[in-house]
Amino acid sequence: MSCPYAGNGNDHDDSAVPLTTEVGKIYGEYLMLDKLLDAQCMLSEEDKRPVHDEHLFIITHQAYELWFKQIIFEFDSIRDMLDAEVIDETKTLEIVKRLNRVVLILKLLVDQVPILETMTPLDFMDFRKYLAPASGFQSLQFRLIENKLGVLTEQRVRYNQKYSDVFSDEEARNSIRNSEKDPSLLELVQRWLERTPGLEETGFNFWAKFQESVDRFLEAQVQSAMEEPVEKAKNYRLMDIEKRREVYRSIFDPAVHDALVRRGDRRFSHRALQGAIMITFYRDEPRFSQPHQLLTLLMDIDSLITKWRYNHVIMVQRMIGSQQLGTGGSSGYQYLRSTLSDRYKVFLDLFNLSTFLIPREAIPPLDETIRKKLINKSV
């Protein structure tokens, strides 16, 4: 049956007049299916001992790599749009659309893992010997995704050698080096956040107003705690308020913030963090609606990559246990489990924004000057 969207929907109309006289490519030629469908070479079959599930293993990983290619394509286009001094609202909408596409692709990749889990550990053992020294650690495209997203080299868990050294191909190494040098999505989003309207000290000066609101909020909390009749409960509440004050100090004191960045506990510059907090507070304002969606999608991407890593870890443990080495010589399960930590979470600061929230009624109201400025559709 032919595709109803490609023609007039009549499978038997041999007299249909072509829409163009140019000779086009047919479906298989356009998609190069002869190459694509001939790329599943089962090593067990070459060894005259074919293992049925090796075919599933190959197909699943090839599908991953195809989707990785699309994610890289989307990331590169998004980085190009963000790498500008001014980003108008139409571009922000396109960035949101493409980030959402990446989110949907990652959801699909997470859902592919259960298909691979239909293979039992014994089935996997039947062909695992053919895989060495190949390893998922050698996926160039996944490393490029990490770098383009913003995973820092110093944040990576080392195993045996530097991650780029597993690639013997010089072209692959050049791709890795270029992806490390080019501005990552993290860096470009940071620059964009630093330009958030309303942060200017000579204008609305959101940061100063926010600090005043936090001081008033904490002071009200102290007054409420002092009225607590039970001494033990009062002391507990006062101690909790002091802890919260220290948490806020970590964002209001630039030196403390910078120390946390150097330690790897924060990613954004101090100015970018201010922008992210402002967008979060005023997300209901039309001007900040799309930026808030953008930040939410970045967290979704981080979350889904973590879920994919987790599913991969669990699958590896089911297939080879937690003591065996991986096929590429890595520590297998132990190495993969270590990648689930926050050090691999690129937009960690966005996840932690909720730490610094204050009640809605305490949020500094926007004045007419900043409201007029927010009508400007570019930033």
Curated annotation (Swiss-Prot):
It comes from the Eukaryota. It catalyses: L-tryptophan + O2 = N-formyl-L-kynurenine. Signal peptide: none annotated. Binds 1 heme group per subunit. Heme binds at H312. It holds the Pfam family Trp_dioxygenase. Pathway: Amino-acid degradation; L-tryptophan degradation via kynurenine pathway; L-kynurenine from L-tryptophan: step 1/2; Pigment biosynthesis; ommochrome biosynthesis. Its cofactor is heme. InterPro entries: Trp/Indoleamine_2_3_dOase-like, Trp_2_3_dOase. Substrate binds at F57, I58, I59, T60, H61, R128, T327. HAMAP family: T23O (MF_01972). Belongs to the tryptophan 2,3-dioxygenase family. Heme-dependent dioxygenase that catalyzes the oxidative cleavage of the L-tryptophan (L-Trp) pyrrole ring and converts L-tryptophan to N-formyl-L-kynurenine. Catalyzes the oxidative cleavage of the indole moiety. This is Tryptophan 2,3-dioxygenase. It comes from Drosophila sechellia. The lineage of its organism: Eukaryota, Metazoa, Ecdysozoa, Arthropoda, Hexapoda.
